[in-house]
């Protein structure tokens, strides 16, 4: 039964049938690596046990998260539907697509947000850009546009554009937001799931982080309206406030306070009241 199903599975996972261009080879390699990573984790759990592997991943979670972001930036992996431009221009929209399909309904991302971000490279990431409209436009007010300004301290996911350029900046923008959202949610659930013995329920935190990061609502609005940034700001500020209250060293408390202020600025500068009001009320109740 497995052997009979293999051709269909192979075609769906690797899409070997249409391999005709040289571009498909690196795409297949990236696809193979994406499949290999979870298989390595499963294999390690079988060989060494689920609990030791889980504890190792918990201890090195920030290093693992940074490694995932670095790999995505190096390989130019993002969730953008910018491939739709190939479709509009009469080309194959699946070119260089590792997985999935460019979504036509995500026009806010590939027609507005991403082109605005890319255009900043041609203006030196200036505060005003005259490439749109009949007069220079205020680009800082645009959520997705990176600007060389001090206020970008509160928009850390834009730093990839300034440091790495448009293509890898886009990869950083997508991957960093997802990884940081997962880690922030994980830390939040660790914080609220402590029992009286101060035992952290890592399994509960992991499931909670998965449910938040992969929630349909989050994924639907992932590319626009800064919902991930708002959630990250809330989760990180709650965790830092909890640690601020429990730490007596002044240097640590100052660092926690600084991070909370950055989160407050990040939340305020998302500039989307429809989400800010409801999430702000939720934060007050928490």
Where are these regions (language model features)?
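Active-site lumenal/periplasmic loops and adjacent helix-entry segments of GT-C-fold
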Residues: 82-232
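Alpha-helical transmembrane segments of polytopic membrane proteins
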Residues: 26-38, 174-176, 226-233, 279
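Short, aromatic-rich amphipathic segments at membrane interfaces
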Residues: 2-28, 154-166
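Specific aromatic-rich, kink-prone transmembrane helix
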Residues: 231-246
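Conserved small/polar residues in nucleotide/adenosyl-binding loops
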Residues: 285-286
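Short hydrophobic alpha-helices at membrane interfaces in multi-pass membrane enzymes
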Residues: 245-265
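Transmembrane helix irregularities
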Residues: 214, 265-274
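Start-transfer (signal-anchor) and selected internal transmembrane alpha helices
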Residues: 27-80
